[in-house]
């Protein structure tokens, strides 16, 4: 009898968070609003000095969100390469332009990087797709979803997972905070 996909999913998560791993399982992040709030918190924590200890205002965070709306995976990849090892967003605060670090390539596997795992995220139906979808496992770095995994048991080809992701792309599910996946 083939293993249930839910069991495979749980085993993957357990492996990621096992022992001294830096991955943290976040079963509290279930909505897009939850994800944006989590990203905002991490961005503010990693840029306290640049923000002079202040929080981002809602309008400033809207500027950040607008910069994270990538029209293609290629555009997201270009941004993720960063400049001088840093992936940045820019915010206009009064007369000052703030350069906030989203990811620092020098902090891979340590430093200020935060590694989180979510599962069963529910991508809601919208005008492009009339169906809700559930994402199996998503890996996030500094609150930004970057890797999406659709798991399959032995009764299903790994290509089924590939085609499932292609379907989600066609339905516009990798938009908003998921546009960097």
Annotate each PLM feature.
Residues 1-181:
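An alpha-helical interface "stripe"
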